[in-house]
Swiss-Prot record:
Class of enzymatic activity (EC top level): isomerase
SUPFAM superfamilies assigned: RmlC-like cupins
Biological process according to GO: inositol catabolic process
UniProt keyword annotation of Isomerase present: yes
Gene Ontology molecular function, alphabetical: 5-deoxy-D-glucuronate isomerase activity; glucuronate isomerase activity
Taxonomic source organism: Halalkalibacterium halodurans (strain ATCC BAA-125 / DSM 18197 / FERM 7344 / JCM 9153 / C-125) (Bacillus halodurans)
Gene that this sequence comes from: iolB
Keywords: Isomerase
EC numbers: 5.3.1.30
KW Isomerase (keyword) present: yes
Designated name of the protein: 5-deoxy-glucuronate isomerase
Length: 270
């Protein structure tokens, strides 16, 4: 199996808490981005102390309480399925803080991490504060929920976004990349994709490739799989009859999202 494609682990790490994914610098070719997905049974609690990283807690589904033991946000989360296609609540927690998550209902949460040195306030990112965009045209259309865009100064390194792509469409397309620290033309950002597919027996295709093809992998990505993008272009194709959701986490040396389209395919938007 590709080193870029990750299947769910589903390991119970404490009572009522199941680790679905755990992407770290130790098990992935990433320097800036880390990611966990957790399933919590109703009433279960998960706690973690951050050291040199910040974290964005995304309530993917269900309802939870989140606290940093100074500030508490209760009953956050807005949906039972991501395919309700409405924004959800998230919480930003800075480095050197401890946070706890208690499940009010059965819940899935995503923990998105990036390096951080400067402490910032814990912040509730309300669903209604997500910027919603509709991008593309033709069979290249998708809806975007901006949870932590680069225009929001709430984080030091993290960029977090949800993308919904309908049946028969492409996203992250035309193929683009952000793997060179070459501003203003391009920024260097690693990225992870957490995928869901509806109906759940479906799949999408994702290709990750570089100009010189030293990296060139095309993957069949199933429901709840992850794809790691250390560098290169990374388009996603959604077959007829299925809908795609993915949660993107990006981070790099500068908190700016500036991508570069593959010149061979940029003509489709000209």
């Amino acid at each position: 199996m590709s080193q870029l494609l990750r299947k769910p682990e589903r390991a119970e790490i404490s009572k009522g808490v199941t680790l679905v994914h755990d992407v770290t610098a130790d098990n992935a070719s990433l320097e800036y981005v880390s990611f966990k997905a957790l399933d919590l049974s109703q009433g279960a609690t998960y706690s973690e102390t951050l050291e040199n990283k910040e974290c964005c807690i995304v309530v993917v589904t269900g309802k939870v309480h989140v606290t940093d033991h100074e500030v508490t946000f209760e009953n956050i989360g807005t949906r039972e399925s991501v395919f309700e296609k409405k924004p959800t609540d998230s919480v930003y927690v800075s480095n050197n803080q401890t946070f706890s998550i208690e499940a009010v209902t059965g819940a899935r949460v995503a923990l998105c991490y990036a390096p951080s040195k400067n402490q910032l306030p814990t912040k509730l990112i309300k669903a209604e504060d997500n910027g919603v965009e509709h991008r593309g045209k033709g069979n290249n259309q998708r809806m975007v929920h901006n949870i932590l865009p680069d225009s929001d100064p709430s984080a030091n390194s993290l960029l977090v976004v949800e993308v919904f792509t309908e049946s028969g469409n492409w996203s992250s397309y035309p193929p683009h990349k952000h793997d060179r620290d070459l501003l203003p033309e391009e920024s260097l950002l690693e990225e992870t994709y957490y995928h869901e597919v509806n109906p759940k027996q479906g799949f999408v295709f994702q290709r990750v490739y570089t100009d010189d093809r030293s990296l060139d992998e095309t993957m069949t990505v199933e429901n709840e799989n992850m794809v790691i993008v250390p560098k290169g272009y990374h388009p996603v194709g959604v077959p007829e009859g299925y809908a795609s959701y993915y949660l993107n986490v990006m981070a790099g040396p500068k908190r700016i999202w500036k991508f570069f389209n593959d010149p061979a395919h940029e003509w489709i938007i000209e």
